[in-house]
Regions:
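Charged docking surfaces used in two-component/phosphorelay signaling
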Residues: 2-13, 141-147
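Gly/Ser-rich helix-loop-strand patches that form or flank binding pockets
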Residues: 12-65, 154-185
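Short acidic/Ser/Thr-enriched loop-to-helix initiation segments
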Residues: 52, 63-103, 117, 121-129
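Short, charged/polar "capping" segments at the starts of alpha-helices
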Residues: 36, 82, 109-118, 172
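Glycine/small-residue-rich hydrophobic helix-like segments
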Residues: 114-168
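Hydrophobic beta-strand segments of well-ordered beta-sheets in folded domains
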Residues: 24-26, 70-73, 97-103, 134-136, ...
Length: 185
């Protein structure tokens, strides 16, 4: 176990935490019954704070419950790296027999749509290497943050796991040098 105490903006701390701990995955909890939208453990606030993180997060409800791995939702978009997240989806499918669903929305911009199509093709090909055939769910909502849509969809359709795309690019330095994930992978 590793522990660290940081002071400052929650979004910046969460973004740096994985690297400071040299973590592969960080487990955190959220309070789905929280009525106040500005609380740090509210799912919508938590997802917004994690969007810059380069470390995978496993988010659990604060209530004890048996986790159901039968259905896994993998969000994909146009701009984020998807290799690590797709590997996590394949892990659940291979070792828990999970059904994997690719969750995405289309873009009006043809370049963004092309990038999304490439990410979808990559995810399908990688999962296919493990004999996993994912189902697809295309959202019609282009305005709401995709991860928040996935949270609502997963709750409605009884998904046990959501794998969100947390790498959000890009500082000027990242654009020149490249994202750390690209170099590692």
């Amino acid at each position: 176990h590793s522990y660290i105490s940081l002071k400052g903006n929650s979004k910046e701390i969460i973004g740096k935490l994985g690297q400071l701990l040299n973590a592969v995955i960080i487990v955190t909890s959220c309070n789905t019954n929280e009525k106040q939208k500005n609380k740090a453990d509210n799912p919508s606030v938590l997802l917004k704070n994690m969007e810059n993180s380069r470390t995978a997060y496993l988010i659990c409800n604060q209530k004890e419950s048996i986790v159901d791995y039968k259905k896994v939702l993998l969000t994909l978009n146009n701009a984020r790296e998807s290799k690590e997240k797709t590997l996590w989806a394949s892990y659940f499918a291979r070792f828990f027999g999970s059904e994997v669903t690719l969750f995405y929305h289309t873009y009006k911009d043809s370049f963004y749509q092309k990038q999304l199509n490439l990410n979808l093709a990559f995810a399908r090909k990688m999962l296919g290497q493990f004999s996993i055939i994912p189902s697809n769910h295309k959202s019609e909502d282009r305005k709401t943050l995709l991860d928040l849509q996935a949270l609502n969809y997963a709750d409605k359709e009884n998904y046990g796991v959501i794998i969100c795309q947390t790498t959000k690019d890009k500082s000027f330095f990242d654009k020149i040098k490249g994202l750390e994930e690209v170099k590692v992978l």
